[in-house]
Amino acid sequence: MDEELRSLTERLRQEAGGSAAYEHLVATRDPGELAEVLTAPGQPLWARELAAFRLGLAGDRRAFESLVLLLNHRDPPRCVGAAYALARLGDPRTARAAAALATNELRVAYALHPVRLLVELRAPESVPALITTLERRLRPHDPYRRVALACVEGLGTLGDVRARPVLTEALAHPALAEAAVDALARIPKSG
């Protein structure tokens, strides 16, 4: 069993109170049954999350919308699981959705996992979204340093020369300076 799946199933087992419905969802091999959980009324969040995660790992695109909603959830473990499944889903809409979540100023408190997902995806949307998000985080007294740091580290990982100006700006921020130096060192010299 995949380590991320093991962690998620253990967390959801506790949430579900070890119910028979939980055990059935963990055991079923029927993707149609899992997809039905995503749309059936009255399903608990743990059931929808488990079904979406399992479908995502199987590459079943019916999980996409549910996983995107979970990626933007206020509970970080749900975001982590959704990002993991979305990275393996293979849906071409994933990068656009992650970029939209990462750059949404109304939901910036929940942008950490969309930012990390963009780095993992290495999609055309990744660098522009990370640059935009980081530019906004460089404002004075911005409270979202973890998001800013993830952007700096991600831009270094992606190694795109378009990130050089914003990373240079990040050098002036003590909480980001060391990571910005490392990120800039990973970006090829332009010109």
Regions found by a protein language model. Name each.
Residues 18-22, 51, 82, 114, ...:
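Conserved hydrophobic register position within alpha-solenoid helical repeats
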Residues 19-20, 45-57, 80-85:
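Non-membrane alpha-helical segments in proteins
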Residues 21-25, 54, 85-88, 117, ...:
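Core register positions within helices of long alpha-helical scaffolds
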Residues 2-8, 26-40, 60-72, 91-104, ...:
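Amphipathic alpha-helical scaffolding segments comprising HEAT/armadillo-like alpha-solenoid repeats
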Residues 107-116, 120:
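A contiguous pocket-lining binding segment that forms or flanks enzyme active sites
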Residues 144-169:
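Extended alpha-helical scaffolding segments
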Residues 42-44, 74-75, 106-107, 144, ...:
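Short inter-helical turns and helix N-cap capping residues of alpha-solenoid HEAT/ARM repeat scaffolds
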Residues 18, 48, 79, 95, ...:
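Residue-level detector of extended alpha-helical repeat arrays and alpha-solenoid scaffolds
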